[in-house]
């Protein structure tokens, strides 16, 4: 067993959350940036929610994360977003048997209170893989709370 650094732990938590969203939606979920797809989601753990040294349960970090969903069709975007909203609680913590807790260092993965209603879909431009011209598509952002612990593996 080797010590897991803070950055390694954060990366593992981000990957576990993205894979969890993929299992729920069955759709492509990328980490940090859109690779040039008009139908996908991008998950990114952003910043400490309550300060630089914020803690939860004494040794875990509470982060605000975001999920950007991209679709060429606005109705398909709304369906994808509603599926995710229905799958995640807003205020409930992960229970002891949660698959994320068993396979990673994530203690809590839930919708942030600010995501009670779906934000308005907006248009954005994407340069699809293999093309040079921009394509307009719809996007919406959902916020998540992620509480994870930097720990030994």
Each language-model region and where it sits:
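Charged, amphipathic alpha-helical segments and their flanking helix caps
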Residues: 1-31, 48-153
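Surface-exposed, low-hydrophobicity interaction/linker segments
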Residues: 34-36
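A short, hydrophobic beta-strand-centered structural micro-motif
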Residues: 38-49
């Amino acid at each position: 067993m080797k010590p897991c650094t803070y950055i390694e732990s954060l990366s593992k938590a981000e990957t576990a959350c993205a894979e969890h969203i993929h299992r729920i939606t069955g759709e492509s979920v990328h980490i940090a940036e859109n690779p040039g797809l008009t139908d996908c989601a991008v998950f990114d753990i952003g910043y400490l929610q309550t300060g630089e040294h914020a803690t939860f349960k004494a040794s875990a970090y509470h982060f605000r994360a975001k999920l950007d969903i991209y679709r060429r069709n606005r109705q398909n975007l709304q369906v994808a977003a509603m599926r995710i909203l229905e799958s995640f609680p807003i205020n409930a913590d992960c229970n002891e048997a949660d698959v994320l807790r068993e396979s990673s260092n994530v203690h809590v993965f839930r919708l942030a209170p600010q995501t009670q209603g779906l934000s308005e879909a907006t248009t954005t431009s994407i340069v699809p893989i293999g093309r040079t011209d921009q394509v307009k598509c719809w996007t919406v952002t959902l916020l998540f709370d992620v509480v994870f612990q930097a720990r030994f593996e």
